Amino acid sequence: MPPGVEGQDILRACWAGTAAFTAVAVVTTVFPDPMAVPMAVASLGLLAAGCAAMLWAFQQALERSRYELIGVGGLYFLAGCAPRSVRLSMMAALALESAVALAAASVRPFTASAFGILVPVYALGLSGAWGARHGTFPPRPPEGTTPADVDPNRNGDHV
């Protein structure tokens, strides 16, 4: 976890969920029948938490978008709005969740391991929550003006 950055609580929650899912997925792959319910519950719980985080992030971004230029790539993938260490940490959690989900579902198709495919929504939702709460975005130009130095594709890459 990157030291000295804002949003440590979100980073810790993201990695805790990723670690819990990884542990449950590994055990479910080895013991598919007794772990079917825990795998489904863990996967659906992380999906629900990720969806809630995504909706909260979207609502916060709507409020901030009155004054700042916020893009989807910046909000959910932290492109240009977060320090590199935060972006790498959150995207590493997303990549790990995706890899574990695909591996578990590939090894044990047609079992509860397939529920794991839903889990990457968790890391993506928490990335959005971090971006909405702590992300730095360029200011929105005054109404009716389009200055040449405002590039909406820049999306805060000055961070």
Q: What do the predicted segments below correspond to?
A:
Residues 103-135:
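Hydrophobic alpha-helical transmembrane segments and immediately flanking/interface helices
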Residues 1-22, 132-159:
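Cytosolic-side membrane-entry/anchor segment at the start of a transmembrane helix
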Residues 52-72:
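Membrane-water interface of transmembrane alpha-helices
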Residues 1-5, 66-75:
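Hydrophobic, membrane-facing alpha-helical anchors
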Residues 70-96:
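Short membrane-interface loop/juxtamembrane segments of multi-pass integral membrane proteins
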Residues 2-49, 90-93, 98-106:
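Long, highly hydrophobic alpha-helical transmembrane signal-anchor segments
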Residues 48-58, 123-131:
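Hydrophobic core segments of alpha-helical transmembrane domains
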Residues 31-35, 60-67, 107, 111, ...:
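Juxtamembrane transmembrane-helix termini
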